[in-house]
């Protein structure tokens, strides 16, 4: 008789017995041998085909991308062949993010440059206030400001090195070295000097009808003054009285040695009053001569003209040879200038007509 239970193990526990054949058949799926194998093979084949299709699709996409890139490169090469070749790296495509970064960089660079120029202009404005050149009508250019500042620093350093008070003329010559004529006029106007007095080498560029600085003054052949000049407040019309001048106090003590020795007869400047600040006429600066206080008064005089017609031009000297005797300056019994303005205008017109005939 068979035992339904197996013998107990060493620990005395019963060992599980395998189920009978009919129970095993009910619990396990029916094993149709060749059909199950076919189904498994079909499933594996389907999985393999799907993987192969995916790989093929990926490879095809990669190939398409490569083809597109190759076509683009070929098009770019064709364009490059038509255009001259550029050196350096190829230009990348401008995407939206790169475009935004590019704009931001440009904005920052523009702001830096703007701040730099503002600082430079402010520094130049401060420098223009320091250098001895001031004008309400003209603003010095940047290069002229820097040149004048350099000359000013050099002149001050020479003063410190020598330890002596500088000569005004040499000081102004140092300041105006290498400057343009308008800037020189501005500097001279600030120091109340005439540019021709301290820059004789620049007078060669002046108009041909103007005498150079330092040249002897040639008096006119006629012993009377021209209509454009005020008549001198003397009882005689001798031309030697025209040159009894004193240096204007605007020149300072530096120019007094030029006037101490007295001016010889027939030499020296004509009537030049003190200089006002330079005037700007279309960018060119000129000096306006202000009449002195002595010339504010008017001096009426009478002139006797010959009754007959005027002779020809060569006889002008004979006609006016005795003009000094004919010109009389009565001091009493004459009305002031305001009393007969018409007479003065007629006299000036007559003198002008005589000169231009």
Swiss-Prot record:
The short sequence motif called Nuclear localization signal sits at 90-96
> Would you say which domain of life the source belongs to?
Eukaryota
- For region Disordered, the annotated ranges are 1-96
Q: Give the UniProt keywords, A-Z.
A: Activator, Cytoplasm, Developmental protein, Differentiation, DNA-binding, Neurogenesis, Nucleus, Transcription, Transcription regulation
Q: Which Gene3D superfamilies match?
A: Helix-loop-helix DNA-binding domain
- Kindly list the GO CC terms recorded for this protein: cytoplasm; nucleus
Identify the PROSITE patterns for this entry. Answer: BHLH
Residue ranges of every copy of the bHLH domain listed in the record: 104-156
- Presence of keyword Nucleus: yes
Principal cellular location given in the protein's record: cytoplasm
Task: Write out the biased-composition intervals (Basic residues).
Answer: 84-96
The protein's GO terms of the molecular function aspect are: DNA-binding transcription factor activity, RNA polymerase II-specific; E-box binding; protein dimerization activity
Q: Where is the composition biased (Acidic residues)?
A: 59-81
- Classification via Pfam families: HLH (PF00010), Neuro_bHLH (PF12533)
Compositionally biased spans, kind Low complexity: 9-25
Q: Which InterPro entries match?
A: bHLH_dom, bHLH_transcription_factors, HLH_DNA-bd_sf, NeuroD_DUF, TF_bHLH_NeuroD
Q: Where is the composition biased (Basic and acidic residues)?
A: 35-58
Summarize the protein's role: Acts as a transcriptional activator that mediates transcriptional activation by binding to E box-containing promoter (5'-CANNTG-3'). Acts as a differentiation factor during neurogenesis. Induces photoreceptor cell overproduction in vivo and de novo generation in vitro. May play a role in photoreceptor cell production.
- PANTHER family reported in the protein's UniProt record: BASIC HELIX-LOOP-HELIX PROTEIN NEUROGENIN-RELATED, NEUROGENIC DIFFERENTIATION FACTOR 1
Q: How does it assemble?
A: Efficient DNA binding requires dimerization with another bHLH protein.
Name of the protein in its database record: Neurogenic differentiation factor 1
Q: Which organism is it from?
A: Gallus gallus
The taxonomy runs: Eukaryota, Metazoa, Chordata, Craniata, Vertebrata
User: By which gene is this protein encoded?
Assistant: NEUROD1
């Amino acid at each position: 008789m068979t035992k339904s239970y197996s013998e107990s193990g060493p620990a005395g526990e019963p060992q599980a017995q395998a189920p009978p054949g009919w129970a095993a058949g009910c619990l396990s799926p029916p094993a149709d041998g060749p059909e199950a194998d076919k189904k498994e093979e079909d499933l594996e084949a389907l999985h393999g085909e799907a993987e192969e299709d995916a790989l093929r699709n990926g490879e095809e996409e990669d190939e398409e991308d490569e083809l597109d890139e190759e076509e683009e490169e070929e098009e770019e090469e064709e364009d490059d062949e038509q255009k001259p070749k550029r050196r350096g790296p190829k230009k990348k495509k401008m995407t939206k993010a790169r475009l935004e970064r590019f704009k931001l960089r440009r904005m920052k660079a523009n702001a830096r440059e703007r701040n730099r120029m503002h600082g430079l202009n402010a520094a130049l404005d401060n420098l223009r206030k320091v250098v001895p050149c001031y004008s309400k009508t003209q603003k010095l250019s940047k290069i002229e400001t820097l040149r004048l500042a350099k000359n000013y620093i050099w002149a001050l350093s020479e003063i410190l090195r020598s330890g002596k008070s500088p000569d005004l003329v040499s000081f102004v010559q140092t300041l105006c070295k290498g400057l343009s004529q308008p800037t020189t006029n501005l500097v001279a106007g600030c120091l109340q000097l005439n540019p021709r007095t301290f820059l004789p080498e620049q007078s060669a560029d002046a108009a041909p009808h103007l005498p150079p600085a330092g040249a002897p003054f040639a008096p006119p052949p006629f012993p009377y003054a021209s209509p454009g000049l005020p008549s001198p407040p003397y009882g005689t019309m001798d031309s030697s009285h025209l040159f009894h001048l004193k240096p204007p106090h605007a020149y300072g003590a530096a120019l007094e040695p030029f006037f101490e020795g007295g001016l010889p007869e027939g030499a020296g400047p004509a009537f030049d009053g003190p200089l006002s600040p330079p005037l700007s006429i279309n960018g060119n600066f000129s000096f306006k001569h202000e009449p002195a206080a002595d010339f504010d008064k008017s001096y009426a005089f009478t002139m006797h003209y010959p009754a007959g017609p005027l002779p020809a031009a060569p006889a002008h000297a004979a006609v006016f040879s005795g003009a000094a005797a004919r010109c009389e300056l009565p001091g009493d019994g004459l009305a002031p200038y305001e009393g007969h303005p018409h007479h003065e205008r007629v006299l000036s017109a007559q003198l002008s007509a005589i000169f231009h005939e």
